[in-house]
Amino acid sequence: MPKMKTKKSVAKRFKLTGTGKLKRAQAFKSHILTKKSRKTKRNLRKTAYVSETQEKVMKKLLPYV
């Protein structure tokens, strides 16, 4: 049986933490920022974590990470 391939699109967007959670960046932070408040933009800088239901799917796409 051949090796499983890592989905590179997932590998570049998500990082695995020490506890096994998947860390991701927030969406809505790239453009159209003038109508967003200072507080909103500041909160979008923070990292977010993938939900437990999505985490099961994502970990199948990252077999060697």
UniProtKB/Swiss-Prot annotation:
SUPFAM superfamilies, sorted: L35p-like (SSF143034)
Record keyword NAD present: no
Pfam families hit by this protein: Ribosomal_L35p
InterPro entries, alphabetized: Ribosomal_bL35, Ribosomal_bL35-like, Ribosomal_bL35_CS, Ribosomal_bL35_sf
A GO molecular function held by the record: structural constituent of ribosome
Keywords in alphabetical order: Ribonucleoprotein, Ribosomal protein
GO CC annotations on file: cytosolic large ribosomal subunit
Any GO BP annotation: translation
Keyword Ribonucleoprotein among UniProt keywords: yes
Gene3D superfamilies in the record: 4.10.410.60
PANTHER family: 54S RIBOSOMAL PROTEIN BL35M, LARGE RIBOSOMAL SUBUNIT PROTEIN BL35M
Family: Belongs to the bacterial ribosomal protein bL35 family.
Name of the molecule in the record: Large ribosomal subunit protein bL35
Naturally occurring in which organism (per UniProt): Clostridium kluyveri (strain ATCC 8527 / DSM 555 / NBRC 12016 / NCIMB 10680 / K1)
